[in-house]
Amino acid sequence: AEFKSRTTAEAKFLRALYYFHLVRWFENVPLMTAPLTNPSAYNQPQAPPQETFDQIAKDLTEAMQDLPKRTMKANGGHATYWSASAMLARVYLFCKGYYGTDLNAGGTVIDAAKIRTYLDEIINSGPFSLVPVYADIWKKANEMGTESVWEVSHSSLALLSGSTSNQHQAQGNYNVLYFAPRGIA
């Protein structure tokens, strides 16, 4: 039961993350929260942005209930309570800043005071701290380090497909190597 609830929470976190990207890029997107079981249902109408933002908030607040309060490293790179609450804050700031509205997470209003509570908890109670030397953030030893609330893990061992186009490569850590400050990575 614990595995199922945690896995469902991780799926809700990822759905919220993906919808956050979609709604920022395209604004009106089809909002699907259940599997499509019939081909006639494939043509879904676009949802207004506020409806999508509210679903994102609902997914994140529900996910927070079943995600562990561990660091990314201790949780094997999976979503955590901390990453969901930080993501909710980011979503709120975008929605409030761009649309001027609060979020509604299934009947619970998410406003600035609630977000402040989550951020204070991350800063004061979370297992996070700044790395003393900024340049050390980019070192392999600090992957999923004390500054990491949410991080996508990559491997430098990924094999390239032989293509010279980045579009067709398994990039691994190459972006970090290309774009990190010189002499750091």
Place the predicted regions along the sequence by residue:
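Aromatic-anchored glycine-rich loop motif in surface-exposed flexible loops
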Residues: 1-79, 92-107
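An aromatic- and glycine-enriched ligand-binding surface/loop that stacks and positions planar moieties
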Residues: 61-62, 78-185
